[in-house]
């Protein structure tokens, strides 16, 4: 068995000319890359995923950006990410896929390689059909989800002009950047009317994509019964509560993946790791971490979304800054995280130590930090890089206590219902049910899986006429006081 040093050394030495690798050592190295299960998709993916932004969305002049994708596939990375919102990223993927013989019309089409990859794109559209689509967060004309799906397929596997070859498909399409509660309402609009004779004019993205996942035509948007999508997911970096509501509304387990911001400063903000992450894991979703370097802000990039090639970080880390190895290992050590999507600014086939792909992959397959070491990484990140890196994420200082608390008498018992609390920097470990000032029940925390409220049952004899409250606590459950 190869040591990690031998494995990364052999991968880092892979030349540009060899698309199949230089022999036994390379094949052994790729086969030994660890893989994790992407939730209920059942797919096995390497813990480092290739992001579709950075030099793929903002390539510098003269850069062969497609070679970044070729290099990633050569190194054994099999989760590949892009988006309709990422400028030329999808077109660059198409160039790389032609070099790798991944287009179905290629006489040398490499079907086994295609089947080993998990190709994911995103749509910012909230509707699949709408007579007057609302303007979304993405610049330009309003978008519709099925148009974005077709655009992705033609750019990745077709001619980029509308032609989609037979056999083309995406492993996943994610609804991009869910950042408002209104987004959640819109993407679910018309879902309940799927298959009805009176089709609504406005059909949300979920219902539209579901037809292209299942080969159905309940929305009237898939008359040829195409099966172009294997899985559907969501993404978001601004707010855990928004993603949590989208997941809770999904009572049919349609949403298989969630891409969320998870970096070493996460607990200084909305603490996705203590809110949406445990819910997604409980629902069996595949969890992908993003914003590992905070769009480069960890290494001096402006604290805003990437707008030009000059903002792309090209080095492996930065002198005096926290190690990129630590930043990558941090989210991958969180329970339930499958992989981390990281954009690449630069590769170097001649100097592996300067190759971001090699460095990031080496970090992703190294030993994971303990909880104590994660706290060290958090402290060092805040001290060296500052606590203000996550410009894209809401701040929340402490627990938001449960809402909609109700108590209903049912014969000899009282049913207590409430909607979930939101955690701050520390995870919620218990719910305390209080009658007046007395704690009458202490329950282990559990995520609220659907819109149905959380419940507990009390003997009516313990309640009397005093008010009932539910309090979230970071302490472990305790015995009745």
Residue positions per predicted region:
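N-terminal binding-site loop/beta-alpha segment at the start of enzyme catalytic domains
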Residues: 2-118
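Hydrophobic faces of well-ordered beta-strands that scaffold small-molecule active sites
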Residues: 46-50, 80, 119-121, 173, ...
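Active-site mouth loops of central-metabolism enzymes
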Residues: 53-62, 131-144, 313-318
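Glycine/proline-rich, positively charged
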Residues: 137-264, 281, 285-288
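Structured C-terminal cap/extension of enzyme domains
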Residues: 251-254, 271-406, 411
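Conserved aromatic anchor
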Residues: 414-425
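Recognizes extended acidic, P/S/T-rich segments that occur
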Residues: 430-464
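Beta-strand-rich modules
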Residues: 459-477
């Amino acid at each position: 068995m190869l040591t990690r040093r031998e494995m990364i050394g052999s991968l880092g030495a892979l030349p540009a000319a060899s698309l199949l690798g230089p022999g036994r050592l390379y094949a052994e190295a790729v086969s030994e890359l660890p893989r994790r299960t992407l939730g209920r998709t059942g797919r096995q993916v390497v813990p480092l995923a290739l992001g579709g932004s950075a030099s793929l969305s903002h390539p510098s002049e003269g850069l062969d950006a497609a070679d970044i994708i070729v290099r990633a596939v050569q190194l054994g990375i099999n989760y590949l990410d892009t988006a309709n919102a990422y400028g030329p990223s999808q077109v660059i993927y198409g160039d790389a896929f032609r070099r790798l013989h991944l287009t179905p019309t290629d006489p040398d089409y490499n079907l086994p390689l295609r089947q080993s990859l998990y190709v994911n794109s995103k749509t910012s559209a909230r509707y699949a059909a709408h007579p007057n689509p609302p303007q979304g967060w993405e610049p330009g004309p309003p978008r519709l989800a099925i148009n974005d799906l077709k655009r992705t397929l033609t750019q990745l596997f077709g001619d980029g002009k509308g032609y989609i070859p037979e056999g083309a498909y995406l492993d996943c399409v994610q609804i991009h950047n869910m950042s408002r509660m209104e987004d959640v309402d819109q993407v679910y609009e018309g879902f309940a009317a799927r298959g009805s004779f009176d089709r609504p004019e406005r059909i949300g993205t979920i219902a539209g994509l579901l037809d292209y996942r299942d080969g159905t035509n309940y929305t009237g948007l898939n008359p040829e019964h195409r099966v172009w999508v294997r899985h559907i997911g969501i993404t978001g970096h601004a707010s855990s509560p928004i993603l949590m509501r989208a997941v809770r509304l999904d009572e049919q387990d349609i949403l298989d993946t969630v891409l969320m911001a998870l970096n070493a400063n996460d607990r200084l903000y909305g603490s996705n790791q203590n809110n949406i992450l445990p819910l997604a894991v409980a629902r069996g979703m595949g969890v992908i971490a993003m914003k590992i370097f905070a769009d480069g802000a960890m290494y001096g990039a402006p604290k805003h979304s990437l707008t030009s090639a000059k903002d792309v970080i090209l080095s492996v880390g930065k002198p005096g800054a926290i190690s990129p190895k630590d930043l990558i290992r941090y989210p991958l050590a969180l329970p339930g995280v499958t992989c981390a999507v990281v954009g690449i600014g630069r590769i170097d086939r001649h100097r592996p130590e300067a190759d971001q792909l090699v460095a990031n992959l080496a970090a992703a397959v190294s030993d994971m930090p303990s909880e104590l070491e994660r706290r060290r990484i958090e402290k060092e990140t805040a001290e060296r890089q500052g606590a203000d890196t996550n410009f894209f994420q809401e701040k929340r200082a402490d627990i938001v206590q449960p809402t909609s608390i109700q108590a209903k008498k049912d014969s000899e018992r009282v049913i207590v219902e409430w909607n979930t609390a939101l955690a701050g920097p520390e995870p919620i470990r218990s719910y305390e049910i209080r009658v007046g000032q007395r704690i009458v029940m202490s329950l282990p925390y559990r995520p609220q899986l659907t819109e149905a409220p959380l419940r507990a049952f009390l003997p009516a004899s313990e309640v009397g006429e005093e008010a009932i409250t539910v309090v979230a606590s970071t302490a472990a459950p305790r015995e009745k006081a």
